[in-house]
Amino acid sequence: RRSSDLDELTGALIGLAQAVGEDKAEPETDRLMMEGLFATLTNVNFDDDSLKKQIEAVHQETAKYVPGCMSCQEPCGRTADYSMEKLWQDQEDIRSLKSLLLFGMRGTAAYAYHAMVLGYTNDQVNAFFYKGMAAIGQDREMEDLLPLVMEEGTVNFKCMELLDKANTETYGIPAPAKVEMKVEKGPFIVISGHDLRDLKLLLEQTEGKGINIYTHGEMLPAHAYPELRKYAHLKGNFGTAWQNQQKEFAGLPAPILFTTNCIMPPKDSYRDRVF
């Protein structure tokens, strides 16, 4: 079920990219493209209703760029949702290159989204999402796709620079820090993933309320940033790697805040404590 929803969302994003074409997209379109690609990463979203809402939002955004397509009596299909089944059934080399391009852009979109919520964007990075997604929906030869895959690598490197700039200018230069691995007595919240802004907001909202905060998994590096480490109630780190969460969270007497691509399908033993 989830796989079909993710394919449907990806196909809708390809249709949006075709509709935008070589025009400069609006900021809201960029956000939808980033969020959509991000949502299709592994371990991000297991909520069918949420994915359906994203698909509908993409359709509405596509209609803004090509309003005539919605009422066309002889649709060409160029801006319609792309059927991902066509990609999965394509010739092996074409399928491999398009998949590599798609999976790379999904990762880049995650970086770009985290930078965007801190107020940092890059026009070259954003523009490539449309270029790359449109190419996936078109009939392309290996000679066309391989340079695009290489370009995605370059764009991803630029996006990593952008995210590093966003994080360090917002939270300070990271420095080695000692992190406590034991949980103290008293109320606490565990936060997982790697959205530093979510952690910052959580620290601000719980400051002075007697609630301790513990990172988990990919959030561990947050302790290195001065503007986050300065909060006395950021006490330490809980647990081990993300793939052990279903076992480790089962008996955890605290809410767990998931922020990015770190969540596994929650078990009933702790589902009601997941946010």
What are these regions (language model features)?
Residues 98, 108, 218, 238-241:
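Long, charge-dense tracts
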Residues 188-193, 198-208, 213, 242:
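Core alpha-helical transmembrane segments of integral membrane proteins
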Residues 171, 191, 213-217, 257-260:
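General beta-strand structural signal in soluble alpha/beta enzymes
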Residues 10-173:
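Electropositive, gly/pro-rich neighborhoods at or near active sites that engage anionic ligands
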Residues 215-233:
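Short connector loops at secondary-structure junctions
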Residues 232-274:
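Phosphate/diphosphate-binding loops
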Residues 199-201, 223-225, 265-269:
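Short helix/loop capping segments that flank catalytic or ligand/cofactor-binding pockets
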